């Protein structure tokens, strides 16, 4: 049963990984075809706002009723989102498809964390996390180039449709294993569906406010978003999360900050290389390959070094590497240095997030209260998704504002990179509050290098 479950989960994460890298690669082509560069950031943000709501609901359902239902519904919605985005006649419809896809991805990821916690013993978890981390290797190596080739040869819509058969295969493998896993022996309470919707709605209002050119409307949206989203976010995350207090709260918060910094830069890399340096989609997309491969390498380095390092050292080092890489990418945009430097710089950032993301992932699971593994994993994914949504959304707002004021797209991209670098510095500061009294024991629970979904899905 465990072998079937492992294969099914790995294939599912592989689908999310390929989709994430493919969308980042082909989005400049989609924007050229449909217009709507002002919605560039929303293509990513909508995905993660949808995931925000579903990951909370699915985590609670997994704790109460088992992982089969949230996984099955999540995979179905993920496939539906692919269909909507692939058939979209306009950029707003692409955004809508990505929203549906994100709802599905959130449910899948919450189910995955709960399945690992319940389907494997503590001694087996190092192995399963390491195996799942490899689900990003093949998409990272071939995904961007394959997506660019398919888009140029058959059209960008085919990239979305090509993922669908593999979703059916993943369901055929994972569903029987999840059915055998059954419901948990000691169900937890789960999180409020109302809070899940409020967090996503508040996040959407905040992002809409940041990108609205009308000052009065922008302020109204920001105030409403904060009033709706912040109290709900406090209720669905561990105590002390928003304040970054030590222990579980700080660990969950740095998860959001690390995705803010990393994906707030990565989402605009292909666009930057195309607009500023004139690279073809295939070459521009390859920068994502360097980041993806180095991400996985960083997670394996973490596994080797973690017994000799403290959690504080691991995670602060990760933020430092991400900041260094982002500064290198910014230098490629602002100076005439060779564009190949962007590939090297992004490899540094990829190694950084692999090193730190793995530590945060399993640290949160280890600190989760009994009977709350699904909800705690969901809380981590909430901050993961919120960080990515705001990293890409704020960057997208910078691009939209620049274009709206008649400035070059490159000006908005530069602002997006600077914002992401600031996020990395803040993350480094919060990570210094983590326990530094003893060597990290995170390695005892294994590693995980897969983004949230995304990574970006």
Language model region names:
Residues 71-73, 125-137, 186-196, 240-253, ...:
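Cytoplasmic-side transmembrane-helix entry/capping segments in multi-pass membrane proteins
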Residues 8, 74, 79-81, 97, ...:
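Small-residue hotspots
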Residues 152-255, 261:
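Hydrophobic transmembrane-helix bundles of small-molecule transporters
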Residues 28-31, 116-121, 126, 130, ...:
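Helix-terminus/helix-capping segments at the ends of transmembrane helices and short amphipathic helices
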Residues 25, 48, 52, 58-189, ...:
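Helix-loop-helix hairpins in multi-pass membrane proteins, especially solute transporters
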């Amino acid at each position: 049963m465990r072998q079937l479950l492992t294969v099914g989960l790995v294939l599912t994460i592989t689908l999310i990984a390929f989709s994430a890298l493919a969308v980042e690669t082909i989005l400049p082509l989609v924007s050229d075809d449909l217009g709507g560069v002002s919605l560039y950031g929303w293509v990513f943000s909508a995905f993660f706002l949808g995931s925000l709501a579903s990951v909370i609901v699915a985590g609670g359902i997994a704790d109460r009723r088992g992982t089969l239902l949230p996984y099955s519904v999540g995979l179905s919605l993920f496939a539906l989102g692919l269909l909507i985005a692939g058939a979209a006649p306009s950029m707003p419809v692409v955004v809508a498809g990505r929203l549906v896809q994100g709802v599905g991805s959130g449910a899948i990821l919450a189910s995955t964390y709960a399945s690992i916690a319940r389907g494997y013993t503590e001694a087996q978890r190092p192995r399963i996390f390491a195996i799942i981390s490899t689900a990003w290797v093949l998409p990272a190596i071939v995904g961007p180039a394959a997506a660019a080739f398919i888009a140029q040869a058959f059209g960008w819509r085919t990239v979305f449709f090509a993922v669908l058969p593999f979703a059916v295969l993943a369901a055929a493998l994972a569903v029987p294993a999840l059915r055998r896993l059954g419901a948990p022996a000691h169900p937890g309470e789960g999180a409020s569906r109302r809070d899940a919707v409020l967090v996503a709605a508040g996040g959407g209002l905040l992002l809409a406010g940041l990108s609205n050119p009308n000052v009065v409307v922008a302020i109204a949206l920001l105030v409403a978003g904060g009033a709706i989203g912040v109290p709900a976010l406090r209720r669905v995350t561990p105590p002390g999360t928003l304040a970054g207090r030590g222990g579980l709260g700080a660990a969950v918060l740095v998860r959001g900050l690390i995705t803010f910094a990393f994906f707030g830069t990565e989402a605009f890399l292909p666009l930057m290389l195309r607009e500023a340096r004139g690279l073809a989609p295939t070459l521009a997309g390859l920068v994502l390959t360097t980041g993806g491969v180095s991400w996985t390498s960083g997670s394996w380095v973490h596994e080797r070094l973690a017994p000799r390092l403290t959690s504080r050292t691991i995670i602060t080092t990760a933020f430092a590497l991400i900041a260094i890489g982002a500064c290198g990418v910014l230098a490629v945009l602002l100076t005439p240095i060779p564009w190949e430097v962007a590939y090297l710089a992004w490899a540094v950032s990829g190694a950084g997030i692999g090193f730190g993301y793995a530590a945060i992932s399993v640290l949160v699971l280890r600190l989760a209260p009994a009977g709350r593994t699904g909800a705690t994993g969901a809380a981590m994914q909430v901050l993961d998704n919120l960080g990515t949504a705001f990293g890409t959304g704020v960057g997208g707002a910078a691009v939209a504002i620049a274009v709206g004021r008649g400035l070059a797209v490159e000006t908005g991209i530069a602002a997006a990179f600077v914002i992401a670098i600031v996020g990395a510095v803040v993350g480094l500061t919060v990570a210094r509050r983590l326990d530094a009294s003893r060597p990290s024991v995170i390695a005892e629970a294994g590693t995980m290098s897969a983004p949230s979904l995304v990574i970006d899905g």
